[in-house]
């Protein structure tokens, strides 16, 4: 029986660590001569060594000891690399345990494979200096700091047999998202979820400044973590052999504590919030590397952050120092003559799917399944009298989502920053609660329970987005709903997720993922008491600038349209789906059959709102969004009343990026299809929920440039719903006026009409200031048939 705390085992562990360090240094500098069998020549060295050293040895040490507890306790564990610029860590360790070669057979576990391994790192056509999708075992790249712990938690939700070993960099720990993440333990259910083991990796320095936690004593950190309901364990040193027994003891205690918490919770149904373990690990930055250089201290300082020794292909003056550094790891004790890791070292790596880089959770999840969806038609809204049935789209949709939860009790969740109720998803609470493991005050709290399918009890967009990202990367499904303006808080996170999807899609060995579904509600065009700060539809533009193969933007005009796109979104793969949906009472216009056609085609000509009678239109109205649709229809009523001979074509757009040219978007309409909708030269009055330049950019590649866009113009205030549209000239009166002015044969005889619209707008201006409400002709408007 293996003694995992014997000197013999620790000796093997030390060699494994040294081998990982050797491989990590080699990846920085070399592209040939990986075993240093001969003198280094210029052609052995990279022209521009690129990468980082400072965080590597400490993480390699942690990784080796995590392998030890995997072997000892048989746990399923995966590694989340929080510190920035530590790309070699997961590459080197997965190469040593064989999982890297399984993903990349050309990178063999011998001298030739090691040569390729070294050359490809931070090399054109090679691999990144972060834990990018090309890295086996990674679900978190770490290029943008702050999300490691939320990613670890998202992955272990509903995965009760998994442990996320989350290494938190001491620089990363200073970011806002990571600071919020220490409160994630309040949402981990010890019965139904797995566990996270955070390891705060304190090496003292960031890029050029000291890390703040490194200037805190163990007592201060203990107080901090106890206050956050964690149980801290400390390991510190710079002598690895002396540290091994202590590190092993702390790791053992942490794993046993996790197992004890879970055993008690699962056997006794004890959902009390536990004190989960956290490890605080202190080691020098750039540990085992050059001690000094040019009379300045390197190891243990910020100077170890990147490339410690100035050696490159054109500058071999100090190559002896590089050789001494690499030989300090005694490669002859680690690899045989052919470059294969020695059997006694290889044998201590976990085997099969117990290897962290081969854990299936890191490659699309453990037994992922599609959603079992209810029939969205069962929730259809009656639109027999168009526009007269007033409903809240999100409220209607919540009944559908309620039944999605019922049918998928372990692989579907809703996420948000304390906004699920505000966003009118009332139906969810008929069947589930907000998951909340912290103490609950039953007399005052609402819909809180230790187990629930809603995670929105932390007011942090970063947390909700981070949880959803890895919940989907590990094969499950979810939706993040948020106020429209504050999805912008995480637009950089969303960009990072897009970059992950794009790069992962290029890898044959990577399984695909359920799509990331974002719902933007509490939208800009009705904020009531919130005002200007809550008005920003810019995520539409932000995402439209990404590779369109991975982005969909849906703007359903009413509840049936929202329902009709649901199956397209719910079981979609490898995309980011953005849905703009209204939570306010709005007229319902489209039958379910019409909504299905719009969802399938992305857009459609609405015959009942058009007055062309099969002829060429004088003007094309197009609407993308709830308020744009409503105001366009109201404008059509005004125009038809005043100009009954005006031939109007009305188009409702649901899938916005379908309008992009196929030169930009392979899913886009051909020029011929586009012209059939929008003509080649007739004026197009395009009403849009977002910033106008996005529509202008779409039309730039098309024949028809006779475009008049009415969207969000960065005008806002605390005001009435209709006045928000007036401020941005997205209202029916401005639209009708612009329509007549854009058609030469109507513009001259329409002068009086244009003045009439101005007069109405002036009356509106005064009325809302006198009465605090919109004009009766606006609030009481209903659709009048134009055919």
UniProtKB/Swiss-Prot annotation:
EC number(s) reported in the record:
4.1.2.-
Please list the coiled coil stretches: none
Q: Which Pfam families match?
A: XFP, XFP_C, XFP_N
Q: Name one GO biological process term.
A: carbohydrate metabolic process
What cofactor does its activity depend on? thiamine diphosphate
Instruction: Spell out the molecular function terms from Gene Ontology.
Output: aldehyde-lyase activity
Q: Does the keyword Lyase apply?
A: yes
Q: Which UniProt keywords apply?
A: Lyase, Thiamine pyrophosphate
Which EC class is this protein assigned?
Answer: lyase
Query: Where on the tree of life does the source sit, at the highest rank?
Result: Bacteria
Q: Which PANTHER family match?
A: PHOSPHOKETOLASE-RELATED
Its family remark reads: Belongs to the XFP family.
Q: What is this protein called?
A: Probable phosphoketolase
């Amino acid at each position: 029986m293996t003694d995992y705390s014997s000197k013999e085992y620790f000796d093997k562990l030390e060699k494994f660590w040294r081998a990982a360090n050797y491989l990590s240094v080699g990846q920085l500098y070399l592209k040939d001569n990986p075993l240093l069998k001969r003198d280094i020549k210029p052609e052995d060295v990279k022209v521009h060594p690129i990468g980082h050293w400072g965080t590597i040895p400490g993480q390699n040490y942690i990784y080796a000891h995590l392998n030890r507890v995997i072997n000892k306790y048989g746990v399923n564990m995966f590694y989340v690399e929080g510190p920035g610029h530590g790309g070699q860590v997961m590459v080197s360790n997965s190469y040593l345990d064989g999982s890297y070669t399984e993903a990349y057979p050309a990178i063999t576990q011998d001298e030739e494979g090691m040569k390729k391994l070294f050359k490809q790192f931070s090399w054109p056509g090679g691999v990144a200096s972060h834990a990018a999708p090309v890295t086996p075992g990674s679900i978190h790249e770490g290029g943008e700091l702050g999300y490691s712990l939320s990613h670890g938690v998202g992955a272990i939700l509903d995965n009760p047999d998994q442990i996320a070993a989350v290494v938190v960099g001491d620089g990363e720990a200073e970011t806002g998202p990571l600071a919020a993440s220490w409160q994630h333990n309040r949402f981990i259910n010890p019965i139904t979820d797995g566990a996270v083991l955070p390891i705060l990796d304190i090496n003292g320095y960031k890029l050029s400044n000291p890390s703040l936690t490194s200037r805190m004593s163990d007592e201060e950190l203990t107080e901090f973590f106890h206050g956050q309901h964690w149980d801290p364990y400390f390991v510190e040193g710079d002598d690895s052999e002396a540290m091994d027994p202590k590190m092993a003891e702390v790791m053992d205690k942490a794993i046993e504590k996790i197992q004890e918490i879970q055993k008690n919770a699962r056997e006794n149904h004890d959902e009390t919030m536990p004190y989960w373990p956290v490890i605080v690990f202190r080691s020098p930055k750039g540990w085992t590397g050059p001690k000094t250089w040019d009379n300045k201290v390197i190891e243990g300082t910020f100077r170890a952050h990147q490339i410690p020794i100035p050696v490159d292909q054109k500058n071999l003056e100090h190559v002896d120092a590089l050789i001494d550094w690499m030989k300090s790891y005694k490669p002859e004790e680690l690899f045989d003559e052919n470059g294969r890791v020695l059997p006694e070292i290889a044998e201590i790596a976990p085997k099969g799917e117990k290897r962290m880089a081969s854990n299936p959770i890191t490659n699309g999840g453990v037994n992922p399944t599609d959603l079992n969806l209810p029939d969205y038609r069962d929730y259809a809204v009656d639109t027999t009298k168009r526009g007269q049935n007033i409903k809240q789209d999100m409220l209607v949709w919540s009944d559908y989502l309620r039944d999605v939860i019922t049918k998928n009790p372990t692989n579907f969740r809703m996420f948000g920053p304390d906004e699920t109720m505000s966003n009118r998803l009332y139906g969810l609470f008929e069947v589930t609660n907000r998951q909340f493991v912290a103490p609950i005050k039953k007399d005052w709290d609402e819909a809180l329970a230790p187990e629930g399918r809603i995670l929105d009890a932390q007011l942090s967009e970063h947390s909700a987005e981070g949880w959803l990202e890895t919940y989907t990367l590990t094969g499950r499904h979810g939706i993040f709903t948020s106020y429209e303006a504050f999805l912008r808080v995480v637009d950089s996170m969303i960009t990072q997720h897009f970059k992950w999807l794009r790069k992962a899609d290029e890898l044959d060995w990577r399984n695909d993922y359920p799509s990331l579904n974002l719902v933007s509600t509490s939208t800009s065009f009705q904020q009531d008491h919130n005002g200007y700060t809550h008005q920003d539809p810019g995520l539409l533009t932000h995402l439209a600038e990404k590779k369109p193969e991975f982005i969909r933007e849906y703007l359903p005009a009413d509840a049936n349209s929202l329902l009709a796109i649901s199956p397209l979104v719910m079981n979609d793969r490898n995309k980011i789906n953005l849905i703009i949906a209204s939570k306010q009472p709005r007229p319902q216009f489209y039958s379910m059959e019409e909504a299905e056609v719009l969802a399938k085609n992305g857009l459609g000509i609405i015959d009942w709102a058009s007055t062309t009678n099969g002829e060429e239109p004088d003007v094309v109205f197009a609407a993308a969004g709830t308020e744009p649709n409503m105001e366009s229809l109201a404008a059509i009523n005004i125009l038809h009343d005043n100009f009954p001979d005006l031939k109007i074509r009305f188009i409702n757009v649901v899938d916005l990026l379908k309008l992009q040219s196929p030169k930009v978007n392979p899913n886009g309409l051909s020029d011929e299809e586009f012209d059939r909708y929008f003509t080649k030269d007739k004026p197009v009055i395009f009403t849009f929920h977002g910033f106008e330049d996005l529509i202008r950019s779409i039309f730039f590649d098309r024949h028809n440039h006779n475009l008049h866009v009415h969207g969000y113009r960065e005008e806002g205030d605390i005001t009435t719903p209709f006045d928000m549209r007036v401020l941005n000239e997205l209202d029916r009166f401005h639209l009708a006026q612009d329509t007549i002015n854009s058609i030469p044969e109507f513009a001259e005889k329409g002068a009086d009409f244009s003045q009439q619209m101005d007069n109405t707008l002036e009356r509106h201006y005064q009325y809302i200031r006198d009465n605090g409400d919109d004009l009766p002709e606006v609030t009481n408007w209903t659709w009048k048939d134009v055919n």
